[in-house]
Amino acid sequence: MKTFSAKPAEVTKKWVIIDATGLVVGRLATLVAMRLRGKHLPTYTPHVDCGDNIIIINAAKVVLTGRKRDNKVYYHHTGFIGGIKERTAKSILEGRFPERVVEKAVERMIPRGPLGRVQMGNLRVYGGAEHPHEAQQPEPLDVAAMNRKNMRAA
């Protein structure tokens, strides 16, 4: 029997919605990264985008364990000499774009390359409960019910 290799035309992509209220960031990100790549499917093919389209709502209400909310630092560089900047996870979550914490966690679990960029395009993260993807009829995925460690009382 020959090894199965999925063709891009054969892939059917599902729409999945996840409510991130009270979920632990790292555990949510690993599950989302796996589904974006399609590794949860028996038809997974490494060089084909066979993952799902994922919508994450309430990303502002995620939880970091331990002291990471205060101590975890996100760095970026302006491009100028001495232009390295840092922000804590707390300042990002309380700031203008709290969904960036979840986006960065997932992005750093996806391979860096052309296919990884396409797969990251299948992720939509919203800080609040509203999203513009009702027409796609996403099916809800209850991450908190999968494992008791996925959820923390905030």
UniProtKB/Swiss-Prot annotation:
Top-rank taxon, per record: Bacteria
Coiled-coil residues: none
Biological process (GO), any one: negative regulation of translation
UniProt keyword annotations, A-Z: Ribonucleoprotein, Ribosomal protein
Alphabetized SUPFAM superfamilies for the sequence: Ribosomal protein L13 (SSF52161)
Keyword Iron among record annotations: no
Pfam families membership: Ribosomal_L13 (PF00572)
GO molecular function: mRNA binding; structural constituent of ribosome
Gene Ontology CC: cytosolic large ribosomal subunit
Family: Belongs to the universal ribosomal protein uL13 family.
Function: This protein is one of the early assembly proteins of the 50S ribosomal subunit, although it is not seen to bind rRNA by itself. It is important during the early stages of 50S assembly.
Subunit details: Part of the 50S ribosomal subunit.
Family annotation (PANTHER family): LARGE RIBOSOMAL SUBUNIT PROTEIN UL13M, RIBOSOMAL PROTEIN L13
Protein name as annotated: Large ribosomal subunit protein uL13
Native source species: Rhodopseudomonas palustris (strain BisB5)
Gene of this entry: rplM
